[in-house]
Curated annotation (Swiss-Prot):
Subunit record text: Dimer of heterotetramer of alpha, beta, gamma and delta subunits. The nickel-containing alpha and delta subunits constitute the hydrogenase activity. The beta and gamma subunits (flavin-containing dimer) constitute the sulfur reductase activity.
The protein, known as: Sulfhydrogenase 2 subunit gamma
UniProt keyword annotation of Iron-sulfur present: yes
PROSITE patterns for this protein: FAD_FR
InterPro entries in the record: Cbr1-like_FAD-bd_dom, Cyt_c3_hydrogenase_gsu, Dihydroorotate_DH_ele_sf, Dihydroorotate_DH_Fe-S-bd, FAD-bd_FR_type, Flavoprot_Pyr_Nucl_cyt_Rdtase, FNR_nucleotide-bd, OxRdtase_FAD/NAD-bd
GO molecular-function terms, A-Z: 2 iron, 2 sulfur cluster binding; flavin adenine dinucleotide binding; metal ion binding; sulfur reductase activity
Gene3D superfamilies, per the entry: Dihydroorotate dehydrogenase, electron transfer subunit, Nucleotide-binding domain of ferredoxin-NADP reductase (FNR) module, Translation factors
Length: 288
């Protein structure tokens, strides 16, 4: 696929996940493009709304599954527009872009997925890829959300709380705002659900730090505390991966909108990332 070209895709399903997020399922009009389109978990695409504008968004589905899916939060002019679109409408897709998570490198190891809020979307791609492939030792998912109503992919999360161990997946959930639904969920899964922040979910957990990788995505304020917890447990900076989705525009490193760092170490978020290790963050000013 030409990385500079936008390909037409039909919206085949729109699902409301929360009051602010919708899940868009897509299929390319060109059958050859549809069959050959592939990507790595952690990569992103540029959504092109013809005659209106474009924006970057992570793929939240797994490369092992169809259709391709995008989880889009309604926050600005472009996302408000696409939230008004319906099944059958056509949008443009170009990409995929970015480096993605090094899934091959991590085969045979434990995966510790740590998501906060909307950060669950790109990590969902990793989650189902890891489950489907069966190439990883154990999968942990620690997910922090504001409330029950804000849980992304709620049905999937509850299914994994119930049956995740059968899929070699250990899931824990933290919520901040106490509601009747959260209390009910906590009663049903007292060892897996609690009121608090995502780092509270580490209590009682032990990891083989020599055979584990941590993958983090969430609001910027979360990274500091999660990384500190991981380092305190002995995980090396090179085994801590973060996906940093901010300030991206063109997707190919041409516009310079996402440059961070200094003359000593410059990174393009869209081209060198959006996935970086904590070692990268230590050597590049402004990365986190």
């Amino acid at each position: 696929m030409n990385p500079y070209r936008s390909y037409d895709a039909r919206i085949i399903e729109v699902k409301e996940l929360t009051s602010r997020e919708k899940l868009f399922s897509l299929k390319f009009l060109d059958n050859e493009i549809e069959e050959n389109f592939t990507f790595k978990p952690g990569q992103f695409v540029i959504v092109d709304i013809r005659g209106f504008g474009e924006f970057p968004i992570s793929l939240c589905s797994s490369p092992t599954r169809r259709p391709i899916q995008l989880c889009i939060r309604r926050v600005g002019r472009m996302t408000k527009f696409i939230h008004k679109m319906n099944e059958g409408d056509i949008i443009g897709i170009r990409g995929p872009y970015g480096n993605g998570f090094p899934m091959d490198l991590m085969e045979g190891s434990n995966l510790i997925l740590i998501a906060g809020g909307l950060g669950m979307a790109p990590l969902r791609s990793v989650l189902w890829y890891a489950i489907d492939s069966g190439k990883y030792e154990k999968i942990y998912l620690f997910y922090g959300t504001k409330s029950y109503e804000d849980i992304l992919f709620r049905d999937e999360i509850i299914h994994l709380l119930k049956h995740g161990e059968k899929l070699n997946c250990h899931v824990k959930l933290a919520y901040e705002v106490e509601t009747p639904s959260c209390i009910y969920l906590e009663r049903g899964f007292s060892e897996k659900v609690c009121k608090g922040v995502v780092t509270d979910l580490f209590r009682g957990e032990e990891f083989d730090v020599e055979n584990s990788y941590a993958l983090i995505c969430g609001p910027p304020v979360m990274y500091k505390y999660v990384i500190r917890e991981l380092l305190d447990r002995g995980l090396s900076p090179g085994r801590i991966y973060m996906t940093l989705e901010r300030r991206m525009r063109c997707g190919v490193g041409k516009c310079g909108h996402c440059i961070v760092g200094t003359s000593v170490s410059i990174k393009y978020i869209c081209k060198d990332g959006p996935v970086f290790t904590y070692w990268d963050a230590l050597s590049t000013r402004g990365l986190i």
